[in-house]
């Protein structure tokens, strides 16, 4: 059977970055504002400037804490099922950091939680756009037409433009956005959608 691929963002899709960052920020004396769950920008979530928020995100992403993030929702179970039962391999495309130690911690974190599911981990600069890397991946024959999972609508669209099949992981900050792709509340939704398409019975419903 030919190998099947899922290209995926990590933070907010596979790993619960928000939980880890929230604990780290609280430890450093920062508090979330009311209604934070509906805001994507970290500065707005903590009542600070965009620049200050971005600086703290980079600091967190390059700290030891980044190697110990928990799985998001039911990701651990269904990623393993897709890999072990249905022969899917995963490629991580994450705007984490260019720091090599951060990449090593991310790779170890994923392996500890997801076993051998991830074939490759691609780390971009903190908060970087993914357009160029998605275009490059689309030109690699084995990845052509793969699934593409994101929580940021703009990145989902960038992948769809390269022929990937988009799935948006729903959060408070994106739940009212219109996207070109399936919207999932958890990995069980993703699993059911992917397997349904494998069987030719896929339905596109929000």
Model-found features: residue ranges?
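Substrate-recognition element of Asp-dependent hydrolases with the DxDx(T/V) motif
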Residues: 66-71, 75-110
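Metal-dependent phosphoesterase signature
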Residues: 31-32, 39-80, 86
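Anion (oxyanion) recognition and catalysis
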Residues: 26, 83-84, 160
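Acidic, Mg2+-coordinating phosphoryl-transfer loop and its flanking beta/alpha structural elements
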Residues: 143, 147-185
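Short acidic-hydrophobic, aromatic-tinged amphipathic segments that line or gate anion-handling sites
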Residues: 122-126, 181-193
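Substrate-recognition "cap/lid" segment bordering the active-site pocket of phosphatases
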Residues: 93-147, 153-156
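Short catalytic/ligand-binding loop motif for oxyanion handling, primarily in non-cytosolic enzymes
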Residues: 15-17, 23, 90, 99-103, ...
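Active-site neighborhood of HAD-like aspartate-dependent phosphohydrolases
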Residues: 1-52
């Amino acid at each position: 059977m030919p190998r099947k691929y899922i290209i995926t963002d990590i933070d907010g899709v596979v790993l619960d970055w928000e939980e880890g960052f929230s604990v780290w920020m609280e430890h450093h004396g920062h508090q979330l504002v009311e209604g934070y769950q509906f805001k994507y920008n970290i500065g707005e979530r903590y009542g600070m400037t965009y620049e200050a928020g971005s600086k703290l995100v980079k600091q967190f992403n390059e700290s030891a804490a980044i190697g110990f993030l928990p799985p998001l929702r039911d990701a651990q179970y269904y990623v393993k099922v897709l890999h072990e039962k249905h022969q899917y391999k995963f490629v991580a495309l994450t705007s984490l950091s260019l720091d090599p130690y951060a990449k090593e911690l991310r790779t170890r974190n994923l392996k500890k939680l997801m076993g051998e599911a991830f074939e490759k981990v691609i780390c971009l600069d903190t908060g970087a756009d993914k357009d160029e890397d998605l275009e490059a991946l689309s030109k690699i024959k084995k990845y052509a037409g793969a699934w593409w999972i994101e929580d940021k609508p703009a990145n989902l669209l960038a992948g769809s433009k390269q022929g990937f099949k988009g799935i948006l992981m729903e959060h408070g900050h994106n739940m009212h956005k219109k996207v070109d792709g399936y919207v999932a509340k958890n990995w069980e939704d993703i699993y059911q959608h992917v397997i349904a398409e494998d069987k030719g019975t896929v339905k596109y419903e929000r």
